[in-house]
Design a protein with these regions (language model features):
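Alpha-helical cap/lid subdomain in secreted, periplasmic
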Residues: 2-191
Length: 191
């Protein structure tokens, strides 16, 4: 997807915004680890003397079967393609019930997925990304005010009976206002 974006628009972007997590939760994706570790010999100096030590060395996990691994793969690729652009991640919104037909019923966030995880676990991983990859993360899970698990908030979602997952026009307006205030505090480019 990032290659397609780069082919179509090249460097002509102000910023790259990645909204992720909700499909990973619904798809029962394991969280995984940010790093793998291996003991290695390393040269170092201290007190005027050089010597060799054995220390754990961590490298980024590129395990695409996990959320952290997928984030690492995507962030490495984005950082390499767009080193002068601001990259911003968004946490998912809260999730209400959704039914898109037989075989596609999605319980609300009040239920664990098949990994035994709640949506909050995925939100936490996305928030951690800021520290691993030096990118801002806008926590729309917390800041948007959209809470489809409460019937009074169904007015912001597509259908109160079948789609409390996707925001409607008013829900998008709330999300847009949240993003406007958060994004205005960030520089777009480093040039």
């Amino acid at each position: 997807l990032t290659d397609k974006l780069h082919q179509e628009v090249g460097e002509d972007v102000d910023a790259i915004i990645v909204f992720l997590g909700t499909n990973d939760y619904n798809g029962d994706l394991p969280l995984g680890n940010w790093f793998t570790e291996k003991a290695e010999h390393v040269q170092r100096g201290k007190g005027g003397k050089d010597f060799e030590d054995v220390r754990l060395h961590r490298t980024l996990s590129m395990d695409q079967g996990t959320l952290r691994g997928r984030i690492n793969v995507a962030m490495k690729h984005l950082k390499e393609l767009y080193p002068t652009k601001q990259i911003v991640l968004l946490t998912p919104l809260h999730r209400g019930y959704a039914c898109f037909g037989k075989g596609n019923r999605q319980p609300s966030e009040d239920y664990q997925n098949e990994q035994g995880l709640y949506i909050d676990h995925y939100v936490d991983v996305i928030l951690e990304t800021a520290h691993v990859w030096a990118v801002p993360v806008i926590d729309v899970f917390a800041l948007s005010g959209l809470l489809p698990t409460m019937p009074c908030h169904w007015q912001y979602f597509c259908n109160e009976e079948t789609d409390q997952l996707h925001p409607n026009t008013e829900g998008h307006r709330r999300l847009a206002k949240t993003l406007l205030t958060q994004l205005s505090a960030l520089p777009c480019t480093w040039e």
